[in-house]
Amino acid sequence: MEVPTARLLLLLLLGAWAPAPESASPEAPLLVNEDVKRTVDLSSHLAKVTAEVVLAHPGGGSTARAASFLLALEPELEARLAHLGVQVKGEDEEENNLEVRETKIKGKSGRFFTVKLPVALDPGAKVSVVVETVYTHVLQPYPTQITQSEKQFVVFEGNHYFYSPYPTKTQTMRVKLASRNVESYTKLGNPTRSEDLLDYGPFRDIPAYSQDTFKVHYENNSPFLTITSMTRVIEVSHWGNIAVEENVDLKHTGAVLKGPFSRYDYQRQPDSGIASIRSFKTILPAAAQDVYYRDEIGNVSTSHLLILDDSVEMEIRPRFPLFGGWKTHYIVGYNLPSYEYLYNLGDQYALKMRFVDHVFDEQVIDSLTVKIILPEGAKNIQVDSPYEISRAPDELHYTYLDTFGRPVIVAYKKNLVEQHIQDIVVHYTFNKVLMLQEPLLVVAAFYILFFTVIIYVRLDFSITKDPAAEARMKVACITEQVLTLVNKRIGLYRHFDETINRYKQSRDVSTLNSGKKSLETEHKALTSEIASLQSRLKTEGSDLCDKVSEMQKLDAQVKELVLKSAVEAERLVAGKLKKDTYIENEKLISGKRQELVTKIDHILDAL
């Protein structure tokens, strides 16, 4: 699909940005968190922490402007960080996300990040930012095993305070739970509880790097569904199609099922297996077609497909409900039109597709492998990713009519959530002449096949020769030629009969004489050829030679009768013979002639 030059150049300028960690500058001015409002969302199996921070530059004799600020992760949670995003408050567009670089601070362990401000902060100025973090596998089931009829409870441990390298003047924290059934929670600062909410604070004058364990034990029956491993294969064809296939390994990472499973109780009691997973919805692109869903056994017919205006919604229902510790594996595939995702300008191509797509709500992917299969002959491959990914050496993929293989881009990433559903751009060059390669290969293959068959049928692969068989083949060939010549000779008689009839009508003697001459000439030639073939049969020692000789004699009699019919016709036309007498004579001649022809036919059948 041709696109405007400006649009393609914009795609070509997009670049993946994954810088190495750097050290924070010691001369950076010390900032202050004037006000922090934290929201900890624990309503699903993810921990989503959002902090609205009013960042101030107090000055304190320093005239240096603050072009960036530092973020720190809680030591207990940093290993399970899946997503970190920072925005200026009030600017929700994705383009307004601030640049975040991982950094290090001397004398401090843990993970730190430098966030670049859109406008440098002058002394005495303030800026409001929103820090969003998502953590996976930090909600631990407690108890770790439950029966089918029991509810699921989990424990979360975090920090009461906003963990920051800067001091905080005031801070509040609101915790959103999955239910109002809470077993226990920490009581720092006399928190208030309302339904499924816990409100802490305000806390005042909190020093930098402050920590105080926050712990809550509550009921959470939301789907603890985790994709332990996923392989996403994208195969690009310049003939108008992009094939996508996803191999998914699923596991219920909640409390492990203890004891037996009763399907009767599961279907009879609505609250039986309340923490189990019956089904979930996958969102496919709106242009998806030829969708299939199968597992190791085969096609799964319990799935449902709903086509919407902006997407295709697929309800995936495994063959059995998933309880804690249970696993399943399935494959989803579909086709997409390439004109919606593939752009080109001359030999320059840009593929823009999602690195990972929606599998289910609140998704967690422990390990993702993405393989992008480009057309054979693609070169100068470059990958632009919106976040850091790991690349493996490119591979080669062979399929129908490939000669030297299709290049395959292999990329990996661990610990992904919904925020990672973003586009990846692959640039490459491709000579359009190579599109003729496969059709030409098909033509060449058929040409070679037919040529081989022609040569094969003409070759003699017998180890020893059979003289008798060869003789039979020669006799059969000669006999076939004799049959052809005899039929031609009989055709001459019929043609001469027509000549006699025309003569009787026109009374033109020249017509009859010309017919006689033609009959004699052609009959003589055919009879001579038959005699030659008769000699060859005699040479081969075939008893068919006698039958051909007998047929020659019968034919001579037929010829005499044919010529006699011509004489009778001349006498009739000249008035030397009455019509009644001519008719009777003609009947006698025709009868004898028919007997002779019948005998000839019997001989031909015997041949």
From Swiss-Prot:
Q: Which residues carry this modification: N6-acetyllysine?
A: K187, K538
What is the recorded membrane topology of this protein? Single-pass type I membrane protein
Pfam annotation, one family: Ribophorin_I
Metabolic or biological pathway: Protein modification; protein glycosylation
Lumenal-side positions: 25-434
In the record, which residues are listed under signal peptide? 1-24
Question: Where do we see the Glycyl lysine isopeptide (Lys-Gly) (interchain with G-Cter in SUMO2) cross-link in this protein?
Answer: K538
Residue ranges of the TM segments: 435-455
The glycosylation sites are N299
After translation, how is this protein modified?
Answer: Ubiquitinated by the ECS(ASB11) complex.
Question: Per the record, what is one GO cellular component?
Answer: oligosaccharyltransferase complex
Task: Topology check: give the Cytoplasmic ranges.
Answer: 456-607
Q: GO biological process: any one?
A: protein N-linked glycosylation via asparagine
InterPro entries named in the record: Ribophorin_I
* Entry keywords, A to Z: Acetylation, Endoplasmic reticulum, Glycoprotein, Isopeptide bond, Membrane, Signal, Transmembrane, Transmembrane helix, Ubl conjugation
Subcellular localization is given as: Endoplasmic reticulum membrane
Relate the assembly described in the record: Component of the oligosaccharyltransferase (OST) complex. OST exists in two different complex forms which contain common core subunits RPN1, RPN2, OST48, OST4, DAD1 and TMEM258, either STT3A or STT3B as catalytic subunits, and form-specific accessory subunits. STT3A complex assembly occurs through the formation of 3 subcomplexes. Subcomplex 1 contains RPN1 and TMEM258, subcomplex 2 contains the STT3A-specific subunits STT3A, DC2/OSTC, and KCP2 as well as the core subunit OST4, and subcomplex 3 contains RPN2, DAD1, and OST48.
Q: What is its biological role?
A: Subunit of the oligosaccharyl transferase (OST) complex that catalyzes the initial transfer of a defined glycan (Glc(3)Man(9)GlcNAc(2) in eukaryotes) from the lipid carrier dolichol-pyrophosphate to an asparagine residue within an Asn-X-Ser/Thr consensus motif in nascent polypeptide chains, the first step in protein N-glycosylation. N-glycosylation occurs cotranslationally and the complex associates with the Sec61 complex at the channel-forming translocon complex that mediates protein translocation across the endoplasmic reticulum (ER). All subunits are required for a maximal enzyme activity.
Q: Which family does it belong to?
A: Belongs to the OST1 family.
Q: What name goes with this protein?
A: Dolichyl-diphosphooligosaccharide--protein glycosyltransferase subunit 1
Origin organism is Canis lupus familiaris (Dog)
| Taxonomic lineage from the root | Eukaryota, Metazoa, Chordata, Craniata, Vertebrata
